[in-house]
């Protein structure tokens, strides 16, 4: 990004810090994940979990969800004001799985939110440590991105299900702050804005009065976040139009859908971070690793290194393939749901298959599933190489306005050319260049037509051996271009339902 000077790195966003140098960033990110680890260890003690049970990813997710719920001010307030049957607004809990006599058992636990908050603060030097909470939210979001499809959400707002590669972070809660905004895809932002505009169309008072003023500020802020993701002047100018509209309506929805489509070729900048389950940080802290002293980065070798030495287990349903379950979690850990499968496969060192070919359902187990038949297995989360995570969208040789990579949103900064049938995409842009944004639309379409599939993204960037922590010898992989690169090809995943 050319505007690098004005942007905080995403570690700074993640840790809520002002501008810091690299060492300070590494230390504050280290402090954040160390706090998560200490909290996890304490919770395992409270719950009397065995070592094996503490390494079970389902238990990790329950504990993460409990602390997120304990700190969800808005929802807590809502629950207190609207008491619903059988829900204690002061308590939080979930399923904990224990190994008893060679079988897995589910136990529903309930804790005071106040108690959970106390344990969390204690693990984080008495602070609220919002950064750590956001980090957990992003891990859950990355897991959802790898597990579920959002076709229904796309269709409901009038978008095309083929735009699924723009939907990173679509399940992140609103309170996820700057770090959350950085990882949201263009489609996610468009979806949120369209929902807002539709409410305004249906509800006369949405933009009016004191509340309406706050709504308007939120609308403009979201527009600015989305504008910041676009890398071409015409796309940004169109966002200004949408933001400045007196009374946002169908014209703005049209513009936003047009922009989302354009992002399939003129990619937005979307950040990628490797956020790992709490139990992984817990294991490292328990083994005596000092994250704050050693420093940590979400976008470098550190998460790969951590996963090389962590053994995490997962419950497996009777007809699921453990290797496929591992792939799902590996992709979530590296925020690689939207990455080109050929790049992921090369880095992982084993073939990564499209979601339609996976014999596995989500990681979480529903409360009505039968535990009698549950087994568990080790998740294989190691990798053959590591690569730097990107925030650029993969536009070629630093031309801001060239093609990014279609049908994927690159996660790793690794050279590849662009597997796309431009004709297929351009077909989505039939006709409509009228209206007040016509010149911008024409300009955007022209740029898209000039994008060529032979272009190379991330020129000269490669992957690195795991022994090469300073990233000195890039290995530039060559890919078989005939393969379909999208994970969503032949999709058969379940829909995400809140």
Swiss-Prot record:
Transmembrane segments: none annotated. Coiled coil: none annotated. A motif (Unconventional nuclear localization signal) lies at residues 1-18. The keyword RNA-binding applies. Residues 1-21 are annotated as: Disordered. Keywords: Capsid protein, Helical capsid protein, Host nucleus, Host-virus interaction, Ribonucleoprotein, RNA-binding, Viral nucleoprotein, Viral penetration into host nucleus, Virion, Virus entry into host cell. It is found in: Virion; Host nucleus. One of its GO terms (molecular function) is structural molecule activity. The keyword RNA-binding applies. GO terms for biological process: symbiont entry into host cell; viral penetration into host nucleus. InterPro entries: Flu_NP. A motif (Bipartite nuclear localization signal) lies at residues 198-216. Belongs to the influenza viruses nucleoprotein family. Homomultimerizes to form the nucleocapsid. May bind host exportin-1/XPO1. Binds to viral genomic RNA. Protein-RNA contacts are mediated by a combination of electrostatic interactions between positively charged residues and the phosphate backbone and planar interactions between aromatic side chains and bases. HAMAP family: INFV_NCAP (MF_04070). This is Nucleoprotein. It comes from Influenza A virus (strain A/Ruddy Turnstone/New Jersey/47/1985 H4N6). The gene is NP.
């Amino acid at each position: 990004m050319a505007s690098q000077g004005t942007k905080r790195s995403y570690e700074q966003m993640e840790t809520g810090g002002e501008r810091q140098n690299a060492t300070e960033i590494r230390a504050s990110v280290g402090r954040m994940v160390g706090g998560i680890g200490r909290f996890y260890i304490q919770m395992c003690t409270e719950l009397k979990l065995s070592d094996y049970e503490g390494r079970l990813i389902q238990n990790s997710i329950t504990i993460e969800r409990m602390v997120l719920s304990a700190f969800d001010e808005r929802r807590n307030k809502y629950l207190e004001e609207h008491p619903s049957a059988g829900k204690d607004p002061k308590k939080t809990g979930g399923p904990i799985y224990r190994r008893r006599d060679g079988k897995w058992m589910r136990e529903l636990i309930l804790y005071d939110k106040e108690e959970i908050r106390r344990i969390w603060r204690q693990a984080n030097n008495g602070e609220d440590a919002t950064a750590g909470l956001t980090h957990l939210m992003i891990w859950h979001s990355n897991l959802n991105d790898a597990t579920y499809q959002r076709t229904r959400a796309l269709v409901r707002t009038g978008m095309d299900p083929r735009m699924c590669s723009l939907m990173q972070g679509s399940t992140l809660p609103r309170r996820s702050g700057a770090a959350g905004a950085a990882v949201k895809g263009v489609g996610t932002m468009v979806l949120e804005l369209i929902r807002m505009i539709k409410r305004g169309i249906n509800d006369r008072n949405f933009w009016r009065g004191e509340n309406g003023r706050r709504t308007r500020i939120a609308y403009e802020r979201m527009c600015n976040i989305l504008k910041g993701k676009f890398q071409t002047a015409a796309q940004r100018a169109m966002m200004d139009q949408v933001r400045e509209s007196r009374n946002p309506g169908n014209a703005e929805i049209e513009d936003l859908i047009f922009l989302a489509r354009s992002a399939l070729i003129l990619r937005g900048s979307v950040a990628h971070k490797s956020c790992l389950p709490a139990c992984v940080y817990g294991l490292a802290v328990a083994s005596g690793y000092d994250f704050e002293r050693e420093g940590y980065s979400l976008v470098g070798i550190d998460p790969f290194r951590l996963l090389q030495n962590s053994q995490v287990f997962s419950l497996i349903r009777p007809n699921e393939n453990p290797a496929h379950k591992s792939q799902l979690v590996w992709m979530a850990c590296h925020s690689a749901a939207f990455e080109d499968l050929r790049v992921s496969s090369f880095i992982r060192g084993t073939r990564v298959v499209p979601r339609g070919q996976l014999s596995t359902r989500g990681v979480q187990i529903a409360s009505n599933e039968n535990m009698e038949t549950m087994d568990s297995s080790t998740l294989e989360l190691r990798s053959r190489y590591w690569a730097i995570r990107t925030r650029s969208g993969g536009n070629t040789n630093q031309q801001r306005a060239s093609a990014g990579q279609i049908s994927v949103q690159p996660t790793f900064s690794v050279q590849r050319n662009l597997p796309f049938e431009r004709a297929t995409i351009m077909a989505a842009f039939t006709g409509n260049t009228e209206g007040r944004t016509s010149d911008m639309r024409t300009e955007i379409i022209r740029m898209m037509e000039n994008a060529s599939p032979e272009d190379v993204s991330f020129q000269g960037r490669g992957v690195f051996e795991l022994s090469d922590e300073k990233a000195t010898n890039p290995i530039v992989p060559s890919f078989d271009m005939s393969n379909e690169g999208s994970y969503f090809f032949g999709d058969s995943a379940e829909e995400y339902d809140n």
